[in-house]
Regions:
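Alpha-helical transmembrane segments of multi-pass membrane proteins
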Residues: 1-379
Length: 379
């Protein structure tokens, strides 16, 4: 939005604000300062005005410094409408974080200004787009007294985080009861030494890796496509169809006789996910102004290219196991499903606290690790 402004244009954003507790406004200030610094502006505070009334603050940002005439008009309107001016080029904020963030003249200074023990006020990026999650994981281990100053916004974040942790626990319990217990009751199949362990590792890798690609990309493309519903629909459609196509094409691969596929396929997936990791950002920037249909087609092409070989892994793994015994196949189905369910929740947590790129790196690691059990299982 800032890039689209004329030199004398104005961007206005309003968020919740509380003078007694830190809130989303602090992160908004951090984002505005980062945007101004990226434009080569050395004094962000001269390009920003922050006003508030009751529990809402409004930030005004301009590519050019506010003139005396602009500031006179803002002060007159603020007095008439009973707004409090929290920051302007004429008046520094009394709140340390707001004051220091707008006084930063480098990214390093901004990072230092936004440090907090429990809250994350760093500017949200495309790789970490969770603007409203301002709680650090360290806050989960803190006492209520330590968190008392953080206010209702952080309190809501804390409740949401506990809900995510509860979801992880329920997913683990559900997977154990529905998949784990029946498999344990069926007994461990008799297999040559190391085959069963390699099988568990193989299907755990593809179950985890698949979800570590799917879940983060839904979030990454939500803004690009304009709505989370579009991202979910397009991502699920493209990945499921492409993975199904890959599963069908896997019949043409003689993995039992040609051991090279156990190396070539995982490496191909690693390269394609790495391409998404490196190129999705530049592609989004270059095509963000295209129509919705064009953007959907770009996402489908980008995702399907990696999903086709990803879809080959499951049927090829089953075929590798049939060389030893059909009795172990239910175990492999179960492990794949269990890790997929757990990884879908874990991917959200990783993306929130470490970034979408970290989730993709986990996926890359899973498919790279896949080489080990695949080679061991290939006769």
């Amino acid at each position: 939005f800032f890039d689209k402004l004329a030199p004398d244009g104005l961007l206005s954003v309003s968020r919740w604000y509380s003078p007694e507790a830190l809130s989303e406004t602090n992160r908004l200030i951090s984002l505005a300062s980062m945007s101004l610094l990226e434009q080569g502006i050395q004094n962000p505070g001269d390009h920003a005005v922050l006003v508030a009334r009751n529990t809402v603050a409004t930030l005004l940002v301009s590519p050019t410094p506010f003139s005396d005439a602009d500031l006179d008009q803002i002060e007159a309107v603020a007095a008439e409408m009973a707004f409090t001016i929290l920051h302007s080029p004429r008046q520094e904020s009394s709140e340390r974080l707001i004051r220091d963030a707008l006084a930063s003249n480098s990214v390093a200074q901004l990072e230092a200004a936004t440090q907090h023990q429990f809250l994350d006020f760093s500017p949200p990026l495309d790789s970490r787009p969770y603007f409203f999650n301002i709680l650090k994981p360290s806050a989960l281990l803190s006492t209520d007294a330590e968190l008392g100053e953080l206010g209702i916004v952080a309190g809501g974040n804390l409740l949401a985080t506990y809900t995510l942790m509860l979801l992880c626990l329920l997913a683990f319990i559900g997977v154990t009861l529905v998949i784990g217990v029946p498999l344990l009751l069926s007994g461990k199949p008799q297999l040559p030494k190391g085959v069963f362990a390699n099988g568990l590792l193989y299907f755990a890798c593809i179950g985890t890796g698949f979800m570590m690609v799917q879940i983060p990309l839904i979030q990454r493309f939500s803004v690009y496509l304009g709505h989370p519903v579009y991202a979910v629909s397009v991502l699920l459609f493209s990945m499921i169809i492409a993975a199904g196509l890959g599963s069908s094409l896997s019949d043409r691969i003689s993995v039992e006789r040609d051991k090279r596929w156990t190396l070539a396929l995982p490496l191909t997936i690693v390269v394609l996910i790495s391409a998404i990791y490196l190129l999705s950002g530049p592609i989004i920037q270059a095509t963000i102004d295209q129509g919705l249909v064009a953007r959907c087609l770009i996402v489908i092409l980008l995702v399907a290219t990696a999903a086709i070989p990803m879809g080959m892994c499951f049927p090829l793994g089953l075929r590798l196991f049939r060389q030893y015994s059909d009795d172990c196949l239910p175990w492999m189905w179960g492990v794949n499903g269990a890790t997929g369910v757990l990884a879908s929740v874990l991917a959200v947590a990783i993306s929130m606290w470490s970034g979408i790129n970290t989730s993709l790196l986990v996926a890359i690691a899973c498919y790279a690790l896949l080489i080990v059990p695949a080679r061991n299982l290939s006769r």
